[in-house]
Every structure is written in structure tokens, then in C-alpha cells.
Amino acid sequence: MITLTKEDGPADLDGVTHLSIGVSWDPTGGASGGIMGVLRRKAGTDLDLIAIAMQGPDPVRLAGLDSLDPMGNGSLVHSGDNQTGRGDGDDETVTVEFARLPGNVTSIVFVAAAFKKGSSFQKARNISFKVYDATGGSSQQVADIWPSLLTQDNGCAVAKAVRVGGSWKLEVVNVTGKIKQGDEHALMRFAISK
């Protein structure tokens, strides 16, 4: 397994028919100690993994939040909303089946966001993005992408899958920014700027 960075440049996805990206995090009490820290850790925090299908510069479909199969054909599927970060493994996952994507989809931007009011990256620890080759029905982790822990932002454009002719490439974006919480248009504007 490798850890992908922006400096690595785009990775060829030749032979990869199904790609999954997962996000996991651990809840934290933030800077609160004592009873407040215990209560915050117990409540957890809600980060969201969102995949935005692009047609050139325009967002055309969003997988995540309450939209689990926006194409309606299983080509871009979200696992569902984990609102606490508790449990083992990935808390949320998006899976792409490249051959079933409509031809007008030119790229997919994967974004993690503390999107709902009251959630923040500061209330999560050990945020990790995992990339899986899910070809053939079994998922094999092929890479990790780790965002900076120093951000005060609430959004991270993690990676972007780009159609190049008849194949796809995956490039690490790993850029953070501020997104107005609860505003899907702000989320999409953030994604298309990457």
C-alpha cells in the first residue's frame, strides 16, 4: 500500500473497473476536558464524504448526504451517512463503476466536509481517506490520503477522478477550504474550484 500525495501526480486507473474511496475518523472532545469532553466524544461528530460528478466545469450529480445513487444505475453509489465516526473501518464510502458512468461525466470530485451545523474537523481525529480497487467484487486498499490536521477549514477536496479518452486517472487534490454549512451550492462551488 502507498500513501498518495499531490506531488505524485495522476495515477493511471487502467484495469480498475470499480474504485471506492472511504473516509474514517475518530470522535474527539475538541479542546474540552472533563465532563464536556466526555459528552462530546460520546456524541461524536458528523463528517460527510461527497462525490460530485462533473460535466466539464459543471456539477451534474451529487452522491452523499441523502442522495445514495444519483445516477440511478449503480455507477456512483454512496454507503450512507454515518453521523458519529464511531466503529471500525470506513465510516462512509463512495464506489464508482466506471463503465456504467454516462459518457458526459468527465470527472468526479471527492470532498469530505463538516457540512452539518455544529460539526467540524476540530471535533474529529485521525481523519483518513482510503482508496480501494474494488474490481472483481473484492476491495483491496491501494492507497491512503491523509489531510493536514492544522486546518481551521471545514472542507477538504480529497481527490479527483478524471476521464482521459477511454480511461480514467486519479489525482490527489488534498486542498482545504471553508464551506457554508448546510449549503449544497457552496459545497458544489468549492468542488468545482478544484
Residue spans for each PLM region:
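Intrinsic-disorder/low-complexity signal
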Residues: 1-107, 111-194
